[in-house]
Every structure is written in C-alpha cells, then in structure tokens.
Curated annotation (Swiss-Prot):
GO biological process: mRNA processing; RNA splicing; tRNA processing
InterPro entries: Domain_X (IPR024937), Maturase_MatK (IPR002866), Maturase_MatK_N (IPR024942)
Keywords carried by this UniProt record: Chloroplast, mRNA processing, Plastid, RNA-binding, tRNA processing
Keyword Hydrolase attached: no
Localization (cell): Plastid, Chloroplast
HAMAP family reported in the protein's UniProt record: MatK
Name assigned to this protein: Maturase K
Gene name linked to the record: matK
Keyword Plastid listed: yes
Role: Usually encoded in the trnK tRNA gene intron. Probably assists in splicing its own and other chloroplast group II introns.
Species: Trifolium thalii (Thal's clover)
Length: 506
C-alpha cells in the first residue's frame, strides 16, 4: 500500500482530495491488472502489454456516459485479440481500479490512526478471523441468552453510494461508479436479487468486498452507539483485526469481553453485559438479559436495517435461545454451553455446609454431519460416511495421491484443532485414510487387504494420525508435552487466514 500513498499524494498535488482524476491514470489499472488478472485462467499465458490498453478503458468509460452499453466495435476487435472477453475483461479491470481508488483514503486514514496508537507493524497480518478466538475461549460465566443474527442482504446500490458519499466528497467519482454498477453489474432493478449479488461478487470480488465491508462497518458503528447508551461498562477495543490484507479494519470494539474484568462488580449494574462477535454475514450477541430485553435488541436491529438501510428484515431471521438449552454455529464450529457442577464442603466452627457451584464452559465441537456431507460431495465417502475410492486421482503417482490426502487432512486438523472434543476430527481422518488406501488399491487393481500386505503401506499411512503430534512435540518441551495434554487442550493456529466451506453453508 505504500505505492497507493504515493499515487494519492500525486493526485492531491493536482486536485485536492479528489479521486476522479485517478480513474484516468494508467498506473491504477496496472496495479489492478497485476493484483487480479495474473491469476486469471484465460490470461495466464500473456503479458501486460498485449492484453491491456488504457485507451480501451477510456473508451469504455466514455461509452458509459453515452449509454451505449459498452459495445465493442469491429475496429477495436482488430487491435485486441480478446474479442470474446472485451466486456468482461475490461469491466473487471475497471472494477479493480474502482476498488483500489476508493480504498486509498480509507487505508490512509486507518494507517494514520494505527501510527497514532503506536500499533506495531507485525499486526498487519492479523485477520478478523482471529478475533473469534477470544470469543470462543471465553467462559460465558455471566451470559444466559444468545442471539443468532444473520446480517440481511442484498442492500440497494443507491444506499451504498449514499453512505460512501458521507466519507468521500467527490461527486464525479460516485456518478461514474453508479453508471458502472448499473451498466456492468445489472443493478438497474429496484430491488437487487441474491442471484445478481452473487454474480457481481464473483466477477468483481474486490469491489464487492469493499462495498459489503463498508455496509457492515456502518451497521456496526450504529449498533455500538446504541450499545454504549445501554450499558455503563466500558468496551474492550480490538481495532487491529483486518478483514483483508490491504483494507478494512474493524472500526472499534470488534470483540467485547467483560466477564473476566468485571466479575466482582457486575451484579451491581442493572444494565446488561453484552458479548458481541461477527464474522462475514453472521454475528452472535450473547447477554445476561431477560428474554424481554433480548427481544428489545432484536427489534432494534430490525428497525435499524429497515429504516436506515432500507433492507427488509423479518423477526424470524434473528433467533434468541437460552445458552444452557440450545447451541449455535459459528465459523464452521458447533458450539454449546456445558454446565459443570461441583460440590464444595465448607466448615464454619462446628457446622458443615455443602455448597454446589455451577460453572459454564463453551464446548467447541467439530460438526461431524456437515463434514461428512462435504466429504460425500467431494466423493471421498458416501452419505453414510463409508469411505470410497477416488478414481479420478488414480492416474497420479502413489506419492501424489498420498500427498493430496495428507494435505486435506492437515488442513482440516489445522482448522479444527481449537475444538474441545476431537473425536469427530479423528473420524474424519479415518475416512480420509481409508479413502486413500482404497484409491491406491484401485490404481493397482487390487483389493485393500492385498495391497496393504504387498506394499506395506500401513506405516506410511500412519502419518494421518501422527504428523500433528510430532509437530507439537517439536514446539513444546518434551518434559511438558504429553499426548494426553494434546487431546485435552485447544490449540488455535494464527496462520488460519480464511474459513472453510462449512462457514458458507451455515
């Protein structure tokens, strides 16, 4: 992002705080090209010079103003070898350019705030997924109810642009952005459909992510204002968690954990203790509220979305459950609260008392049924969880087949090592192990038993169970590390940069 700062300073020297002139600077689209399209399938064999022309970008922008629907003429086809991809290719180039340009002022504002707060540079690789870990590690001592909330979408394009205009005062830029979204993305309907949003997000991932993050950022800022008005407890702020590498830190107070800090003073407050966390389009609101107050928060959210964002949200999209009786799903985990009861004998003079202490613990469980469903969809097992062979991999070498299965197993183990109960994870490993053996036997046209007896692959396939433990034994001192401790403790890996497919299926 250092080059972004240079480009913005260069533009400010010509026109103060205006983003519109940057649209016609070739280096912006050069950055967009190198950022996204070097990974494109149909462009990976070519270079920048013969695939992209700023002149064509300017022509398309001119036609946007003329409302010619970006039709490429025959003369243009002689100059550009990508006749069939002209509209898609240059629309994505312009979309990337818009995303880069509109990110610049927000990134500069964010970086300056982090410098003022003396945030160390090592935090730049922290993602918002890491903010979930304190939530999942909390004891939930004073929390009784949980609200499972889905942030409604789609939101209309005009609302997004109006929100952005509060932050960036550049009318020509937003006028051109509006034209682009209407012509390229088919957002000319009164109410955008989920199908159109999905198509737009796939074709323009960076711009869509920016618009969605800004919408969520605005919603959370209003929610936090309401929360501050309802409680005397100070918020614990985590402002360094990034949704992406280059842009969007959670504005303020991303995760609010109070029970440890206020365990003694909490009963003296009448206002509720709120525990809030969000990732992607789902958020969890846990509180020590009576059902009436939780329903009050529920209708706060509904009226906020309907009145401020013009997004229709129905009460059934927000579920309120008692923690001791219900569970919830977050980040691909299945979570519930377990009550631990213990009896303490207390003696005062000659009288003896038995005191029953009830403590709460959040259990993070691997969702076995959705995982088996995902494995069945990928043809590793059937719907009942019985392992099957993977014939499409039979053309590969034995080493490549084993390495593919090991990679999947490592990724699952890496992601779900924070689980408090790992039996389901071991079952998934067992399915993958047998699927690998059956695939190798299918390749060699043999039965599983005959293949194992002939090749002696049992020891090699033990890596599915032993590799993770060997790695941890190198990290921890041998005198303090034990297999029992490995099974019992939860370990969160900070190199988890994205969630698995189960998060999107919830």
């Amino acid at each position: 992002m250092k080059e972004y700062r240079v480009y913005l300073e260069r533009a400010r020297s010509r026109q103060q705080d205006f983003l519109y002139p940057l649209i016609f600077r070739e280096y912006i689209y050069g950055l967009a090209y190198s950022h996204n399209f070097n990974r494109s399938i149909f462009m990976e064999n070519g270079g920048y010079d013969n695939k992209y022309s700023l002149l064509n970008v300017k022509r398309l922008i001119t036609r946007m103003y003329q409302q010619n629907h970006l039709i490429i003429s025959a003369n243009d086809s002689n100059k550009n070898p990508f006749l069939g991809y002209n509209k898609n290719f240059y629309s994505q180039i312009i979309s990337e350019g818009f995303a880069i340009i509109v990110e610049i002022p927000f990134f500069l504002q964010l970086s300056s705030s982090l410098e003022e707060a003396e945030i160390i540079k090592s935090y730049k690789n922290v993602r918002s997924i890491h903010s979930i870990f304190p939530f999942l590690e909390d004891k939930f001592t004073y929390l009784n109810y949980v609200s499972d909330i889905r942030i409604p979408y789609p939101i209309h394009l005009e609302i997004l642009i109006q929100i952005l205009r509060y932050w960036v005062k550049d009318v020509p830029f937003f006028h051109l952005l509006r034209l682009f979204l209407y012509h390229f993305c088919n957002w000319n309907c009164f109410i955008p459909t989920k199908k159109s949003i999905s198509t737009f997000s796939k074709r323009n991932p960076r711009l869509f992510l920016f618009l969605h993050n800004f919408y969520v950022c605005e919603y959370e800022s209003i929610f936090l204002f309401l929360r501050n008005k309802s409680s005397h407890l100070r918020l614990k702020s985590f402002s360094v968690f990034f949704e992406r590498i280059f842009f969007y830190a959670k504005r303020e107070h991303l995760v609010e954990v109070f029970s440890k800090d206020f365990s003694y003073t909490l009963p003296f407050f009448k206002d509720p203790n709120i525990h809030y966390v969000r990732y992607q389009g789902k958020c969890i609101l846990a509180s020590k509220n009576v059902p009436f107050l939780m329903n009050k928060w529920k209708y706060y959210f509904i009226h906020l979305w309907q009145c401020f964002f013009d997004v229709w949200s129905q009460p059934r999209t927000i579920n309120i459950n008692q923690l001791s009786e219900h569970s919830f799903q977050l980040l691909g985990y299945f979570s519930n609260v377990r009550l631990n009861r213990s009896v303490v004998r207390s003696q005062m003079l000659q009288n003896t008392f038995l005191i029953e202490i009830v403590s709460k613990k959040l259990d993070i469980i691997v969702p076995i049924i959705p995982l088996i469903r995902s494995l069945a969809k990928a043809k590793f097992c059937n719907v009942l969880g019985h392992p099957i062979s993977k014939p499409v991999w039979a053309d590969s070498s034995d080493f490549d087949i084993i390495e593919r299965f090991l990679r999947i197993c490592r990724n699952l183990s890496h992601y779900y090592n924070g689980s408090s109960k790992k039996k389901s994870l071991y079952r998934i490993k067992y399915i993958l192990r047998l699927s690998c053996i059956k695939t190798l036997a299918c390749k060699h046209k043999s039965t599983v038993r005959a293949f194992l007896k002939r090749s002696g692959s049992e020891e090699l396939l033990e890596e599915f169970f032993t590799e993770e433990e060997e790695i941890l034994s190198l990290i921890f001192p041998r005198d303090s590390f034990s297999l029992h401790r490995f099974h019992r403790n939860r370990i969160w890996y900070l190199d988890i940069l994205f969630s698995n497919d189960l998060v999107n299926d919830e």
